[in-house]
């Protein structure tokens, strides 16, 4: 009986760990929305800001990848 409860709680914990993907998706959407807003206001400055755009996107996506890694660790290691 206890093995089933711990397995169930493991799945709940892994599901809760993947909620970090929501923050990652919101962050990437916010980054691109801000970039497009700024590019429409000043099109000549957009090419210089493209590098910053991709750095911000990579950092925001890293949080989502970390949350998936935590979920995998909870499922298979814990």
Swiss-Prot record:
It comes from the Bacteria. It is a multi-pass membrane protein. The chain crosses the membrane at residues 16-36, 57-77. GO terms for cellular component: plasma membrane; proton-transporting ATP synthase complex; proton-transporting two-sector ATPase complex, proton-transporting domain. The record marks 61 as: Reversibly protonated during proton transport. Its main location: membrane. Pfam families: ATP-synt_C. GO terms for molecular function: lipid binding; proton-transporting ATP synthase activity, rotational mechanism. SUPFAM superfamilies: F1F0 ATP synthase subunit C. Keywords: ATP synthesis, Cell inner membrane, Cell membrane, CF(0), Hydrogen ion transport, Ion transport, Lipid-binding, Membrane, Transmembrane, Transmembrane helix, Transport. It is found in: Cell inner membrane. Belongs to the ATPase C chain family. F(1)F(0) ATP synthase produces ATP from ADP in the presence of a proton or sodium gradient. F-type ATPases consist of two structural domains, F(1) containing the extramembraneous catalytic core and F(0) containing the membrane proton channel, linked together by a central stalk and a peripheral stalk. During catalysis, ATP synthesis in the catalytic domain of F(1) is coupled via a rotary mechanism of the central stalk subunits to proton translocation. F-type ATPases have 2 components, F(1) - the catalytic core - and F(0) - the membrane proton channel. F(1) has five subunits: alpha(3), beta(3), gamma(1), delta(1), epsilon(1). F(0) has three main subunits: a(1), b(2) and c(10-14). The alpha and beta chains form an alternating ring which encloses part of the gamma chain. F(1) is attached to F(0) by a central stalk formed by the gamma and epsilon chains, while a peripheral stalk is formed by the delta and b chains. This is ATP synthase subunit c. It comes from Hyphomonas neptunium (strain ATCC 15444).
């Amino acid at each position: 009986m206890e093995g089933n409860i711990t397995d169930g709680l493991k799945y709940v914990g892994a599901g809760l760990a993947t909620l970090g993907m929501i923050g990652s998706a919101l962050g990437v959407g916010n980054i691109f929305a801000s970039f497009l807003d700024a590019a429409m206001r000043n099109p000549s400055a957009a090419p210089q800001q493209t590098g910053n755009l991709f750095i911000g996107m990579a950092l925001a996506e890293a949080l989502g990848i970390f949350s998936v890694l935590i979920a995998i660790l909870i499922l298979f290691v814990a």
